[in-house]
Amino acid sequence: MSNPEPDDSNNRIVAVTLDEESIGRSGPDIEHERAIAIYDLVEKNLFAPEGAGEGPFTLHIGITGNRLMFDIRREDGAPVITHLLSLTPFRRIVKDYFMICDSYYQAIRTATPDKIEAIDMGRRGIHDEGSRTLQERLAGKVRIDFETARRLFTLISVLHWKG
């Protein structure tokens, strides 16, 4: 007899806020990415802090010093846990991601569809690398699926980017 899969219907984020002090000032393309990532994240995600019991949860993301802060709370605002993660593993990935994003946003205005597609494939590859790194850094702390990691990586990039 196999163990039944856990019911994760309540293990999700219902609201996300970004620390205003941490947000890098950026252009409309980056702000658009941030808004889409927050919307998509709240619509569909898996987010289960280890040992916290069932959600749903709210998440406040910020940068404090040299660390990424995940302030996790219950829907009613009761604190669950705050995780501080080193930014070091993300620095190169975020830098590469924004370099290729700049190329992508320039290309969509002037380049051929083949060139745009090639740049976009590279952009998605770097984004996937950042998402996997985030999943690894949260292992044993918060269980997330890959799509949730992708959306969270977008938000981390927006916070980290100082344009």
From Swiss-Prot:
This is UPF0262 protein Rpal_5021. It holds the Pfam family UPF0262. Belongs to the UPF0262 family. InterPro entries: UCP032146. It comes from the Bacteria. HAMAP family: UPF0262.
